[in-house]
């Protein structure tokens, strides 16, 4: 590509080009054909049928059946896939006259390259007759091979000589027709009478019945035998079924239709799969997962290179470290969706940006001429030209970005290890969200049963990947970060910071405001609210910084309204009065006076409001938990869960998940009073780090719906407040945030990770103001400080001035215990 961002040649393949010579890295044994079929696939589709999970691959279940169509579209191609079986019926007669059955079996026995096929076919059929005379049909014995003749006609007596000690194989391995005679002659009169009653036509001819419990996989196998070795046709089968009064009741087989579009744009390669065009029989099958280009850009682990995963700040997985080790890791983009009962992920960092990549370095031997000096037999120096070899390394790779549908996507890193020699990173998704929950409370008997329900709200938009192809000079994580940053800047997601102000980086200071506690008066307990950091204390802290020439301070005022740190759902703007009080002989300060002081000294205030979590609800405040909290798939209120290292599991913390449907209403209630103060900034931390569905019956939201509502709200907040601070920094919130705290500056330190890299820091540096976690709350102060510096992040601290001992009363309250 010579226009746009590229001025070089690069390459990217949807599948590894060396699948044919693939082998396990450890044992050097060739990769099996079934694994190769997966490596050759652009799509892997998982679905459930009768609680059993089945996987289809686009190579085995589409390409090998000639069910792929390629069409030209503008700037690219469209590849249409039909995965599964298009025919509803199998070319396997379910009922057929005895003589016709023998003819089919005879052709299979004579023509099949596999000797066991004739026995496998016969094993699924049972004889229905009323006397031995109906079996008087003779095959052409003269044309039979010895093996086929033995299979059909060897009698039990003859078998004693031909197959000594193998009498149990009579009628199975050999002697099929004599066994049929023995069987019909041994049947009782009662059995014969019942047969005539059930099948009156049996008085005219004997017939064979295929096993009614036969599985689709076996039907497909028998059909292959019939198609490859006989002249039997669907027309003949229709006649046979009519003759034996059989009505077909075959279940419609699993069939999935979808298409991938590949187009070239100014950034490289764009890949699109429309979820609305994924078609299948949803009444019989439940879609579990679609893996999208699972081995695109895969790297050979025999070479050097790495995989970049968006785990936290970014993590590098080196091919040299994982060679021969088979593993798979999967994480959801943007973390947990708390509307689901199933929460996974243990204690790990969240993927805040939907980017990933692979780089592979290939080493080749190159011959070259060199001149060497030597001393001859006369002691004189001579020169000669010699041929030498040297290693030439060249790198190639790509950076992939999910530009649409990221909220419903999962990212998987997979390494073949003992199966094959490739490692890759890819996305997967399910446009039809579903969840499972336990049926109890008397509904089930014995052990609780799991019930799986599919959401009524389906995603019908696009899943889009933008592939940036990297050349040798840019095949590293710096190059990936550069193309990502340039893309975000070109799309208007981020803009350069104004460098005309202070040269100092900002210091983020989060102050803890008011806290409800219990006290006693004359032995009588009562509830009260005490200040941890009053407004006048905030001023004193800022004065201290000013006296030490620290002037670029941004203050996050947490817990200043609606009940303080354990706040009620924000529906209006009411300052906690205790924060405006003075101390000792120092006069108090109103919120408006604090704003005036901050403006005069160029300090930025960010009063914090949580529109995602409901800690407490007050009667008649405009918030209705029944209507405004997100619902789970079984119509329960969605509750946040946090990882507990003691239980090593996710524990409910009692905080309700506010539906994105209700967030705008809550913000409007707060802004009605907040706008009068003209603060110039607002903190809405949770809008940048939490994203959940809502499975309510009336207006359900999938995760993408919630994202759109949150983005719309953030745009409104930005327009009305100017400066907006968020936490975490989910990629969709970047256009509307001026400041980000708690941005990941480390990875999850997985076993297979070589190192964390400051990928996000490289992307956002000089485009956004950001900070990591509060340094003074970190488990390892020095490590966190160094990671802050490495990431180019600003320092961030959380402080409280007075009454800090009150925090210990909330030791079991997860949102506050960390501060004490």
What positions do the PLM features span?
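Aromatic-lined carbohydrate-binding/catalytic grooves of carbohydrate-active enzymes
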Residues: 501-665, 689-693
């Amino acid at each position: 590509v010579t226009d746009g961002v590229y001025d070089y040649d690069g390459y990217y393949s949807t599948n590894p080009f060396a699948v044919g010579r693939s082998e396990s890295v450890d044992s050097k044994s060739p990769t099996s054909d079934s694994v190769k079929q997966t490596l050759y696939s652009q799509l892997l589709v998982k679905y459930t049928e009768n609680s059993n999970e089945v996987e289809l691959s686009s190579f085995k279940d589409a390409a090998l059946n000639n069910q792929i169509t390629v069409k030209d579209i503008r700037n690219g191609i469209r590849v249409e896939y039909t995965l599964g079986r298009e025919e509803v019926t199998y070319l396997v007669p379910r009922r057929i006259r005895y003589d016709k059955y023998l003819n089919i079996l005879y052709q299979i026995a004579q023509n099949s390259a596999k000797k066991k096929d004739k026995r496998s076919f016969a094993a699924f059929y049972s004889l229905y007759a009323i006397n031995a005379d109906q079996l008087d049909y003779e095959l052409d014995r003269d044309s039979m091979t010895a093996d086929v003749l033995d299979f059909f006609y060897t009698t039990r007596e003859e078998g004693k000589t031909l197959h000594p000690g193998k009498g149990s194989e009579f009628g199975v391995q050999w002697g099929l027709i004599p066994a049929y005679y023995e069987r019909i002659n041994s049947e009782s009169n009662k059995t014969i009478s019942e047969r005539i009653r059930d099948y009156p036509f049996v008085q005219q001819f004997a017939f064979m019945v295929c096993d009614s419990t036969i599985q689709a996989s076996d039907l497909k196998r028998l059909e292959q035998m019939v198609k490859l070795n006989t002249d039997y046709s669907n027309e003949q089968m229709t006649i046979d079924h009519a003759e034996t009064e059989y009505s077909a009741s075959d279940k419609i087989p699993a069939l999935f239709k979808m298409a991938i579009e590949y187009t070239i744009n100014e950034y490289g390669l764009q890949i699109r799969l429309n979820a609305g065009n994924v078609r299948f029989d949803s009444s019989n099958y439940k879609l579990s997962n679609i893996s999208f280009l699972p081995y695109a850009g895969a790297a050979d682990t025999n070479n050097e290179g790495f995989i970049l995963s968006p785990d936290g700040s970014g993590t590098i997985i080196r091919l040299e470290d994982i060679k021969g080790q088979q593993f798979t890791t999967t994480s959801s983009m943007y973390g947990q969706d708390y509307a689901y009962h199933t929460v996974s992920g243990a204690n790990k960092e969240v993927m805040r940006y939907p980017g990933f990549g692979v780089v592979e370095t290939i080493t080749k031997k190159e011959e070259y001429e060199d001149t060497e000096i030597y001393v001859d037999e006369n002691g004189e120096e001579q020169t000669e030209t010699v041929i030498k070899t040297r290693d030439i390394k060249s790198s190639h790779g790509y950076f992939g970005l999910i530009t649409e549908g990221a909220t419903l996507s999962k990212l998987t890193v997979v390494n073949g290890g003992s199966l094959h020699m490739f490692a890759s990173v890819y996305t997967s998704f399910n446009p039809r969200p579903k969840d499972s929950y336990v049926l109890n409370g008397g509904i089930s008997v014995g052990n609780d049963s799991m019930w799986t329900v599919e959401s009524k709200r389906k995603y019908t938009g696009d899943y889009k990947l933008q592939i940036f192809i990297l050349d040798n000079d840019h095949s590293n994580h710096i190059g990936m970060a550069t193309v990502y940053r340039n893309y975000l800047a070109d799309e208007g997601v981020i803009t350069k910071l104004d460098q005309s102000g202070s040269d100092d980086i900002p210091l983020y200071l989060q102050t803890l405001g008011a806290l409800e506690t219990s006290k006693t008066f004359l032995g009588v307990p009562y509830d009260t609210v005490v200040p941890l950091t009053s407004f006048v204390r905030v001023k004193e802290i800022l004065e201290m910084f000013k006296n030490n020439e620290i002037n670029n301070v941004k203050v996050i005022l947490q817990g200043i309204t609606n009940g303080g740190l354990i706040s009620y759902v924000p529906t209006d703007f009411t300052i906690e009065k205790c924060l405006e009080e003075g101390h000792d002989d120092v006069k108090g300060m109103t919120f408006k006076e604090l704003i005036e002081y901050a403006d005069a000294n160029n300090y930025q205030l960010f009063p914090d409001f949580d529109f995602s979590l409901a800690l407490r609800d007050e009667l008649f405040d405009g918030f209705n938990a029944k209507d405004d909290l997100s619902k789970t798939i079984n119509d329960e209120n969605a509750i946040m869960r946090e990882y507990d290292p003691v239980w090593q599991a996710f524990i409910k913390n009692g905080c309700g998940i506010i539906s994105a449907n209700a967030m705008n209403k809550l913000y409007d209630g707060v802004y009605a009073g907040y706008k009068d103060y003209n603060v110039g900034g607002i903190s809405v931390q949770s809008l940048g780090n939490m994203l959940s569905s809502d499975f309510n019956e009336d207006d359900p939201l999938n995760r993408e719906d919630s994202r759109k509502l949150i983005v719309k709200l953030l745009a409104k907040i930005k327009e009305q407040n100017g400066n907006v601070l968020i936490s975490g920094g989910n990629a969709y919130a970047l256009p509307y945030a001026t400041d980000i705290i708690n941005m990941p500056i480390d990875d999850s330190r997985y076993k297979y990770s070589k190192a964390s890299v400051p990928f996000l820091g490289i992307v956002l540096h000089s485009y956004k103001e950001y900070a990591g976690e509060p340094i003074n709350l970190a488990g390892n102060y020095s490590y966190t400080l160094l990671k802050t510096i490495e990431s180019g992040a600003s320092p961030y601290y959380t402080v409280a001035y007075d009454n800090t001992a009150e925090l210990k009363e909330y030791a079991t309250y997860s949102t506050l215990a960390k501060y004490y």
